[in-house]
Amino acid sequence: DAKVIDPEFYPFGVKKYEIPGSTNVKKSFDSDQLSILFNAKPKKPEQEKARDFWFFSFVCNGMNVKDIIHLKWKDITDEQIVFIREKTKSTKKANIKPIQVPLSDFAVMFIKKYGNKDQRKSSFVFPILDESMTEEERHKRKQNFIRYINQHLKQLAKANGLTEDISTYWARHSFATTAVRKSA
């Protein structure tokens, strides 16, 4: 076995570079803050749409916005949404289990309000992506849509006395925190 890097120049080890630990604090809203955001009166339609997508993520067990964007009509039944996370679709794992999310009244209303009229099983539920886009175009569209939600959500939150740090990830963490508190 030939050594590729001379130990003298190896960057890791005692008194050398250490990979930093995670400092990512999971941020979430408590029930009072969720109520304020849910009942907030948007000043612009963009704020309403941003809030609605945020709460759709929340009521769908904290579904990632990337997964919402990729939902197809085949993923939705009368009772639930069944999907495989975009994050895990391309992994080599053999036992990837689909996620099942019960459809709440809010989720049904939201899908009726924002869903594509074209409800073929192969069509996207929401008019954000379309089949004719390249992977690069889809990636840009997803990033722009998430930025759009975050930008308008921050405005709505600020106008209602909530933190401007809010983002789409807060829906995931707020759902998880709420679920843990309810089961405690």
PLM region descriptions:
Residues 3-41, 134-136:
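Flexible interdomain linker/hinge and immediately adjacent N-terminus
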Residues 55, 59, 63-67, 172-184:
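C-terminal catalytic core of tyrosine-transesterase DNA break-rejoin enzymes
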Residues 34, 104-163:
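Active-site/catalytic core of tyrosine-dependent DNA strand-transfer enzymes
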Residues 14-15, 70-113:
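Conserved tyrosine-mediated DNA breakage-rejoining catalytic core shared by Y-recombinases
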Residues 2-8, 57-80:
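Short, charged phosphate-coordinating catalytic segments
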Residues 42-44, 86-102, 136-145, 163-170:
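Short, contiguous acidic/charged loop-to-helix segments that flank catalytic cores in large enzymes
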Residues 2-10, 115-122:
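Proline-centered turn/helix-capping motifs that create local helix->coil transitions or kinks
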Residues 41-55:
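Conserved catalytic core of the tyrosine transesterase superfamily
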